């Protein structure tokens, strides 16, 4: 997925796998830790591909290294650890997107996560922002947006787990500040109050 992200325009400057420092994967240097990598390659975003039981430690490591934007795809992060992740991020002014997300894409610019290779058939550049909790509905709804002649600026999958790192209402100001985004589509899920929070925020 790192190569796919590079192909989509993302500047992937290094990877982290403990015990594998010195290796090179698709032109991406590998380091033992985030702190070691960031000394040689300044970075402001971390994309985490780790199992649920290791996600909290990986998030905390990235936060400790000074990274303020983190995305994690892990599905099924233990509830108490998801709460700890959200609290830690909020306490240091950081943003964690996920878990249980396919990622983030700014169409034609960059992508984080596991958004599919056939992306160019669904995601076309336009002026509609998308926030989603549903993996299964995201591509279908986005395809309809494009079919209607609109296109997408940035899509953020907040994740379908009970306690996401970032909530819809917290993302809304980012879309409002983007001059290329003229409207926002929200794809919700059963349960929770995130959709109501957006209505109140507006």
Which ranges hold each PLM region?
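Catalytic-core regions of core metabolic enzymes
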Residues: 1-202
């Amino acid at each position: 997925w790192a190569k796919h992200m590079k192909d989509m325009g993302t500047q992937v400057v290094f990877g982290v796998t403990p015990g594998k420092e010195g290796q090179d994967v698709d032109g991406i240097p590998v380091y033992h830790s985030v702190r070691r990598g960031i000394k040689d390659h300044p970075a402001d975003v971390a994309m985490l591909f780790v199992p649920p039981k290791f996600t909290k430690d990986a998030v905390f490591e990235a936060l400790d290294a000074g990274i303020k934007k983190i995305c994690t795809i892990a599905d099924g992060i233990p509830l108490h650890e998801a709460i700890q992740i959200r609290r830690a991020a909020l306490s240091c002014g950081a943003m964690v997107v996920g878990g249980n997300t396919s990622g983030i894409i700014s169409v034609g610019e960059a992508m984080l996560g596991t958004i599919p290779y056939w992306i160019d058939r669904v995601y076309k550049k336009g002026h509609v922002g998308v926030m989603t909790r549903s993996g299964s509905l995201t591509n279908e709804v986005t395809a309809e947006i494009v079919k209607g002649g609109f296109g997408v600026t940035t899509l953020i999958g907040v994740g379908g787990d009970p306690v996401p790192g970032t909530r819809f209402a917290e993302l809304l100001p980012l879309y409002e500040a983007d001059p290329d985004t003229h409207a926002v589509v929200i794809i919700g899920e059963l349960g929770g109050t995130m959709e109501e929070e957006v209505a109140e925020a507006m």
